[in-house]
């Protein structure tokens, strides 16, 4: 190959290499974006010990130490709740980017509704199942929370509040599932609900989630199961 031809060949190779590199740089951000997971697991209880409360779940009171424990069925571990005359939350710390992952997703099923439970009245405000998103607010008054409830009798879509307005409640389900023991998956846009319920525009930074199966107001008993907590992009 002549010297001039060699220079021309090398120059062409350099141009081609530069063009390829530029294309890679151009598409690199989109490749990284695609690699981001659509969902992040908060807890699927896969590594938890059956018969115990997972160590990273904390009880609001020691009176709830016998309420929550991990149970198992084929191919699934989950958090089982059995409340006998008590009402104690179990919470897990978990911070996430709510703007990027606005959807809160989980599965649940009621096994026993508290006798006479009606979340609209303070004297009967017990639920078989409730899930919270917690947002730091005050060391004295506690966090702000969006609470999702499976009620026995309160109509779906009902809006309630408690804790002097710091807890905003939305009834997601009402009545027994079609089949006893049937799991139901929920997908809620908790960011939209938070902004709407608290009438704010800014995106908060969640501190974690909580569950509550309670029967203290009705002095009865309640049971339910929770599984596969995660946050998703959509």
Give each language-model segment a name.
Residues 66-89:
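Short carbohydrate-recognition loop motifs
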Residues 45, 209, 227-231:
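Extracellular beta-strand elements of beta-rich domains used
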Residues 1-14:
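N-terminal secretory signal peptides that target proteins for export/translocation
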Residues 126-131, 166-167, 171-176, 180-220:
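Extracellular beta-strand ligand-recognition surfaces/modules
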Residues 93-104, 177-180:
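Extracellular/lumenal carbohydrate-interaction signature centered on repeated Trp-anchored short motifs
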Residues 34-60:
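Extracellular carbohydrate-recognition regions
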Residues 15-29:
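Bacterial N-terminal signal peptides
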Residues 111-182, 222-225:
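Extracellular ligand-binding interfaces
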